[in-house]
Design a protein with these regions (language model features):
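C-terminal cap/loop subdomain of S1 sulfatases and analogous C-terminal strand-loop tails that border
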Residues: 94-100, 140-143, 148-197
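Active-site-proximal cap/lid insertion segments
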Residues: 1-85, 89-136, 149-152, 156
Length: 197
């Protein structure tokens, strides 16, 4: 895999804080997020290809380590004889930029690279091994799905959707929309407010 890259002009229609990441020493002193949130990701993202390749190698090393450790967890479930009755979900809270759009790490830049994250589910007897699913799912669905799998009534105040029918292949989708929250000053009149789909 090659490091991602920035394409000239791709930030032309984006909020100004996006383009500042292409500067060597951007000034974010006048930028504030609501609620006193930090400016995570608001810095220069200029890196040479050697640094990007080093970051990519480090990232792959971390992925390999996580793969090894998840394997140990699954082996332990097998050894204890509870693998067949245990729902395992492995995922993350966000993606990671490795040069895509000229960005590194993460931050308040909501491209698909940050939002479309992997998820692996193992639930023998219900979720077919090796099955793939491209349906939209949200992390808010996980607690509802876990309660449903355990046969525990879902409290009415929980807003997630049960994903078990989707994971088992009995449904094509559980939801047709999701929401990702960005703490920034945008209004309905903002030229930077975008809705895709």
């Amino acid at each position: 895999m090659e490091p991602g890259q920035y394409y000239e002009g791709e930030l032309d229609d984006m909020p100004p804080q996006y383009a500042k990441t292409r500067e060597a020493n951007p000034d974010y002193t006048n930028y504030r997020e609501e609620g006193g949130q930090g400016l995570h990701g608001f810095h220069s993202h200029l890196h040479d290809e050697v640094d990007l390749r080093r970051s990519l190698a480090c990232y792959y090393g971390m992925v390999s380590l996580i793969d090894q450790e998840v394997g140990r967890i699954l082996d332990t479930l097998d050894r204890l004889g509870i693998a067949e009755e245990t729902l395992v979900l492995f995922s993350t809270d966000h993606g990671h930029y490795l040069g895509q759009h000229g960005l590194i790490a993460k931050g308040a830049f909501h491209y698909e690279d940050l939002l479309r994250i992997p998820m692996v589910v193992r639930y023998p007897g219900l979720v077919p091994a090796g099955a793939r699913c491209d349906a939209l799912q949200c992390q808010v669905d996980w607690p509802v799905t876990f309660l449903s799998a355990a046969g525990i009534p879902v409290p009415g105040l929980m807003q997630g959707l049960n994903q078990l029918p989707l994971w088992s292949g009995d449904a094509d989708q559980a939801r047709n929309a999701g929401r990702r929250h960005l703490r920034a000053r945008l209004s309905a009149a903002s030229p930077y407010l975008r809705i895709k789909g």
